[in-house]
Amino acid sequence: MDNRIKTVVILGGGTAGWMTAAYLGKALQNTVKIVVLEAPTIPRIGVGEATVPNLQRAFFDYLGIPEEEWMRECNASYKMAVKFINWRTPGEGSPDPRTLDDGHTDTFHHPFGLLPSADQIPLSHYWAAKRLQGETDENFDEACFADTAIMNAKKAPRFLDMRRATNYAWHFDASKVAAFLRNFAVTKQAVEHVEDEMTEVLTDERGFITALRTKSGRILQGDLFVDCSGFRGLLINKAMEEPFIDMSDHLLCNSAVATAVPHDDEKNGVEPYTSSIAMEAGWTWKIPMLGRFGSGHVYSDHFATQDEATLAFSKLWGLDPDNTEFNHVRFRVGRNRRAWVRNCVSVGLASCFVEPLESSGIYFIYAAIHMLAKHFPDKTFDKVLVDRFNREIEEMFDDTRDFLQAHYYFSPRVDTPFWRANKELKLADSIKDKVETYRAGLPVNLPVTDEGTYYGNFEAEFRNFWTNGSYYCIFAGLGLMPRNPLPALAYKPQSIAEAELLFADVKRKGDTLVESLPSTYDLLRQLHGAS
């Protein structure tokens, strides 16, 4: 008996639907018919999208799509980090950093560069020892990453001849990425695109989906169904009746107001990073692209009404709220109890969502697709495959949820009800353990210093996504320091001397690259052929 899956039906287009179609088309080597049912009248969510570095290696390279090709088609720009602004000082939202008591500006970066090490101890721990002993007042991201100097100068992460200088991710227009991948999947992989609206889910006596009925009367039969219908979860939550686990007891923000803001690139340059600007009831993203930046104020409607949030957002950028077209979104925070139920797999917003504080949304999509391809079933839908897939998605999501909550919980801000309420939320045991590990001076998660092992291996990165460097960037950036230096360093004078050479090398590399790299604006103009 032939138990192979013959047809996969994907409900929903957008970024999640077309990434899924394109990836499965490649992974299944054209042995399975793939159909995307996309309602043309459903508006797409998103004003600017930010990503993480493995997007090219884990997704576009796998599809054989060169970086420059999709970047040109999707108005993409470069992202070297998230820059956090005013997460420690009280006050209303402002793109201009305030000043801390120690004289530093209230900013810190979470870059993608990997930490060097001396005697198998990451440079973060030598920096912490120096800082705690009063031997330096340099911030962690400045001392340990050459990328910070590059970003401060608004330089690009690549040379004009396109040689790579450092690690980076991307900003892009999500609707253009969806359109690009739709064209790729339909023309290169023979994916069938059905523009119609689903009206009914047909199931058998076991509760398995057998087909989707459309508004025009078509019956789309399939063996495996992928729900990319967004927050509505039309298959996983409605048809499969799988409960969505609300996690607003960990993360308070549940709404956003967004728009695109014109920008004079020639006068002001283009920033090669995403900005995260703390507000009185949440935070605002800024995603630079040529000629404009996408921006959105993420907030909790328990602490600000839609009108109040819109006014605060408008004031931040000097917008006229009466003459600006805003995109208002209310989102659910959390995940499905199970991402895969019977023969229905949820991907993207239909599966899980956390606010885009660390740009995890697109990553969640292709991580889920990667895991689906790895656990791809036959018609018996082996319980072990399904359960292991669900465990992978659950652990991926919960780890990111905890990492994001730490941003709020350990911020010293208590100037508004929103910031005070974040201190009253319960932390998961896993993040408590990481904080105690950090406070004791030990590395958090596996320290990663080998880019080939980390960025070149999706499985390794998936299981250690938020690295020791990530936790150091956030904890130290928010002013949370280890109680004491790593005790073992007291016995390693030669290693400390080696670390000093590494600190000097970081500064030297940063200075050299600032002098030799083009501005982000100039490189993007070259890439996009702008006159």
Curated annotation (Swiss-Prot):
Residue numbers binding chloride: S360, G361
Recorded catalytic activity of this chain's protein: L-tryptophan + FADH2 + chloride + O2 = 6-chloro-L-tryptophan + FAD + 2 H2O; D-tryptophan + FADH2 + chloride + O2 = 6-chloro-D-tryptophan + FAD + 2 H2O
Enzyme Commission code(s) on record: 1.14.19.59
Inactivation phenotype: Deletion mutant cannot produce thienodolin. Thienodolin production is restored when the mutant is cultured in the presence of 6-chloro-tryptophan.
Record-linked Gene3D superfamilies: FAD/NAD(P)-binding domain
Entry binding sites for FAD: G13, T15, A16, A39, I42, I45, V47, A50, M198, L349, I362
Annotated phenotype, changing V82I: In Thal-RebH5; regioselectivity of chlorination and bromination is almost completely switched from C6 to C7
Enzyme class: oxidoreductase
Entry keyword set: FAD, Flavoprotein, Nucleotide-binding, Oxidoreductase
Pfam families: Trp_halogenase (PF04820)
Subunit text: Homodimer. Monomer in solution.
Function, in words: Involved in the biosynthesis of thienodolin, a plant growth-regulating compound. Catalyzes the chlorination of tryptophan (Trp) at C6 position to yield 6-chloro-tryptophan. It is also able to use bromide ions to generate monobrominated Trp. In vitro, accepts a wide range of amides and peptides carrying either L- or D-Trp at the N-terminus.
Additional detail: The reaction between FADH(2), Cl(-) and O(2) produces hypochlorous acid (HOCl), a powerful oxidant. Unlike the mechanism previously proposed for the tryptophan 7-halogenase RebH (AC Q8KHZ8), which suggests the formation of a chloramine intermediate with a conserved lysine, Phintha et al. propose that the conserved lysine likely protonates HOCl during the halogenation reaction.
Protein name: Tryptophan 6-halogenase ThaL
Species assigned in the record: Streptomyces albogriseolus
